[in-house]
Amino acid sequence: MNKGLLIEGSTFVLGDDVNTDINCSNKYLPGKDVAYVAQHAFEQLSPGIASRIAHHGGGILVAGEHFGINSSREQATHVLRQMKVRAIVAQSFGRQFFRNAINNGLPVFECDTSAIGEGQSLELDLARGVLCCQGRVLQKSHPLPSEILAILSMGGLIPFLQKYPDWNFA
């Protein structure tokens, strides 16, 4: 399996309408490094989530509808990477956040998340479009387009373009 296309981890569940201001608050951004901002991510929604994810050595965020709505703040994905978030599974994403996540090598997967609970074992196979929870298949969907899978397998758009400078996305 290619790097970044098969992801496993414990789940950390958030709700609906998780906007980028909640995971990357303006209150902490000015002049602060990403590690500092990551310590305060989601604190008004799920206090201590950053330390819980760190305690597990990383994890998978699970959300409902509209994850990453509001701003196109690219730092939001940097904060999630700093927190060792391996992927985000949500019912829907803000489109700008979705693209920022892909461009920064952070896997995102849209599916019904209603059956996924906190602390469960999740396995996500992006190449096949399969999501397993606690060892059973929860979701089969269309895999992400090959161009997106290629970007994710390289760790983001910049590493991808450095390796393939003449790539045509047409």
Question: What are these model-derived regions, one by one?
Answer:
Residues 1-26, 159-170:
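N-terminal, positively charged, Ser/Thr/Ala/Gly-biased leader segments
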Residues 18, 68-74, 152-162:
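Conserved phosphate/anionic-ligand binding catalytic regions in large, soluble enzymes, centered on
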Residues 24-128:
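Feature captures the catalytic cores and cofactor-binding loops of soluble hydro-lyases/lyases
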Residues 102-170:
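Acidic, glycine-rich flexible loop/linker segments
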